[in-house]
Amino acid sequence: MPQLVLASTSSYRRALLEKLQLPFITDAPETDETPHAGEPAEALVQRLASAKAQALAGRYPQHLIIGSDQVCVIDGKITGKPLQYSTAVKQLQQASGQCVTFYTGLTLLNTANNSINCTCETFDVYFRTLSQAEIDGYLLREQPWNCAGSFKSEGLGITLFERLAGRDPNTLIGLPLIALTQMLIEQGVNPLTVKPVE
């Protein structure tokens, strides 16, 4: 089995990939994540997921490299990680009572034969109407500065929602495992037939 490389330093993506019980390593890709002018969210996340995987290709021949990138769209505008409290407040104020769509790009690059598979998964988050006290209380408790959309759905962020809609809930956290499993099987790596990590 070719070794897997997760082109990410995200602890969330690492924890998701561990669910598949396959051996893998992580490495930080050097990529410019600046959106191109007028670039749609779907194209942006697919381009960045591919760029992350390809950034590590020279270091990992004969490997399967997984790249992923995520943005959310609030009121038609691409939104990324807030990085600070004031931006997170604005993002949650904009999301209050709205449907926010998350776009997660996923790439699997086989450096042995240079084949590449790329897709985009979407996931809709319907926010309930939030008071300023709820927004402040949430942000002070969870501090989601490195999370697109300013929340952690796997934590207290679940209290912000009215409902969720999408094919794979892992997509919302940053790594679409259903799509990734399909890509891995196409490359001859089936999580159910490979010896699991102990």
UniProtKB/Swiss-Prot annotation:
Its main location: cytoplasm. One of its GO terms (cellular component) is cytoplasm. Its cofactor is a divalent metal cation. Keywords: Cytoplasm, Hydrolase, Nucleotide metabolism. The record marks 12, 70, 154 as: Important for substrate specificity. One of its GO terms (molecular function) is nucleoside triphosphate diphosphatase activity. One of its GO terms (biological process) is nucleotide metabolic process. Its EC number is 3.6.1.-. It catalyses: N(7)-methyl-GTP + H2O = N(7)-methyl-GMP + diphosphate + H(+). InterPro entries: ITPase-like_fam, Maf-like. CDD domains: Maf. Pfam families: Maf. The active site is at residue 69. It comes from the Bacteria. It is found in: Cytoplasm. Belongs to the Maf family. YceF subfamily. Nucleoside triphosphate pyrophosphatase that hydrolyzes 7-methyl-GTP (m(7)GTP). May have a dual role in cell division arrest and in preventing the incorporation of modified nucleotides into cellular nucleic acids. HAMAP family: Maf. This is 7-methyl-GTP pyrophosphatase. It comes from Yersinia pseudotuberculosis serotype I (strain IP32953).
